[in-house]
UniProtKB/Swiss-Prot annotation:
This is Envelope glycoprotein K. GO terms for biological process: fusion of viral membrane with host outer nuclear membrane; symbiont-mediated induction of syncytium formation. The lineage of its organism: Viruses, Duplodnaviria, Heunggongvirae, Peploviricota, Herviviricetes. The gene is gK. It is found in: Host cell membrane; Host endosome membrane; Host Golgi apparatus membrane. Glycans are attached at residues 48, 58.
């Protein structure tokens, strides 16, 4: 059973889960029926060498040319949805439309279901990244409990291992006899691990040279973590191609908000060192600032932190204003287009 004990890892798991749920909601419920597919069209009356134009369904235009048989010998997954709104060309009563209607009638040559593309690319990558990150959390927790961890205060006591607790409960309740073999084994493991951690912190290069298996385990853990985060962040950089005309602006903004938050959270978790234990050796810092210097130091830290918070607030507001100005026409078109 996996229990995410670290608040930092739990926040990342929650963000990835929320991001995946937003994508699933948009794919299943959020997309408008008229904005699910794109069509490669050519106006009626133009030459065959005229370049095809990709566009989404427009109720002011007439789309002709639904195929009577599946393209390329078979329907793609969910491709029939794209052709359901088209009108077969033979149903139109006139063969050559008037010139005034040439630009209102479009011959469809290909259709693509953009929700299918979204489902099989972004949603799948998010799901794979979610499972990989859970695998990283499991590996990290096992290493903190049984392996070499630096700094030493990040170690978790092996006595809290679930199998040890379950064995003690079963032996005391059902067997009416104390079972301590696993506890003694874990205590011996804890002593040996503390010695290994001291050797690692003293000379990590020599330690890993003589014990390459530990380096391989730590390397696999880091690779799984970076691959998981890379898949999540990579969903924002996937080329949308012609389907970009169907995806709403809020989906792009939501994607970048989640991706940037997840990336910054992971970067903060990597760079931030955990708090030192309460019973740490106080001899390492004999000179504690007191008096006027201590007061000045605390005041300076408070002032600098306040300035940093205000700068972040100004940066966020400026970013929102720049995005609004850049997408002003697009926002107006999506708000008032019928």
């Amino acid at each position: 059973m996996l229990a995410v004990r670290s608040l930092q890892h739990l926040s990342t798991v929650v963000l990835i889960t929320a991001y995946g749920l937003v994508l699933v909601w948009y794919t299943v419920f959020g997309a408008s029926p008229l904005h699910r597919c794109i069509y490669a069209v050519r106006p009626t009356g133009t030459n065959n060498d005229t370049a095809l134009v990709w566009m989404k369904m427009n109720q002011t235009l007439l789309f002709l040319g639904a195929p009577t048989h599946p393209p390329n010998g078979g329907w793609r997954n969910h491709a029939h949805i794209s052709y359901a709104n088209l009108i077969a060309g033979r149903v139109v009563p006139f063969q050559v439309p008037p010139d005034a209607m040439n630009r209102r009638i479009m011959n469809v040559h290909e259709a693509v279901n953009c929700l299918e593309t979204l489902w099989y690319t972004r949603v799948r990558l998010v799901v794979v990244g979610w499972f990989l990150y859970l695998a990283f959390v499991a590996l990290h927790q096992r290493r903190c409990m049984f392996g070499v961890v630096s700094p030493a205060h990040k170690m978790v006591a092996p006595a809290t291992y679930l199998l040890n607790y379950a064995g003690r409960i079963v032996s005391s309740v059902f067997l009416q006899y104390p079972y301590t073999k696993i506890t003694r084994l874990l205590c011996e493991l804890s002593v040996q691990r503390q010695n290994l951690v001291q050797l690692f912190e003293t000379d990590p290069v020599t330690f890993l040279y003589h014990r390459p298996a530990i380096g391989v385990i730590v390397g696999c853990e880091l690779i799984v973590r970076f691959v998981a985060v890379g898949l999540i962040v990579g969903t924002a950089f996937i080329s949308r191609g012609a389907c970009a005309i169907t995806y709403p602006l809020f989906l792009t903004i939501t994607t970048w908000c989640f991706v940037s938050t997840i990336g910054l959270t992971e970067l903060y978790c990597i760079l931030r060192r955990g708090p030192a234990p309460k019973n740490a050796d106080k001899a390492a810092a004999p000179g504690r600032s007191k008096g006027l210097s201590g007061v000045c130091g605390r005041c300076c830290s408070i002032i600098l932190s306040g300035i940093a918070v205000r700068l972040c607030y100004i940066a966020v507001v400026a970013g929102v204003v720049l995005v609004a100005l850049h997408y002003e026409q697009e926002i107006q078109r999506r708000l008032f287009d019928v």
